[in-house]
Swiss-Prot record:
BP-aspect Gene Ontology terms: neuropeptide signaling pathway
Localization terms from the record: Secreted
Main location per the UniProt record: secreted
Protein's organism: Sarcophaga bullata
Keyword list, A-Z: Amidation, Neuropeptide, Secreted
Family: Belongs to the FARP (FMRFamide related peptide) family.
Record-level GO cellular component terms: extracellular region
The name this protein goes by in its record: FMRFamide-12
Length: 10
C-alpha cells in the first residue's frame, strides 16, 4: 500500500 521507499521515512 505504501510507496517502495516509504520505509526510508525516519
Amino acid at each position: 500500500s505504501a510507496p517502495s521507499q516509504d520505509f526510508m521515512r525516519f
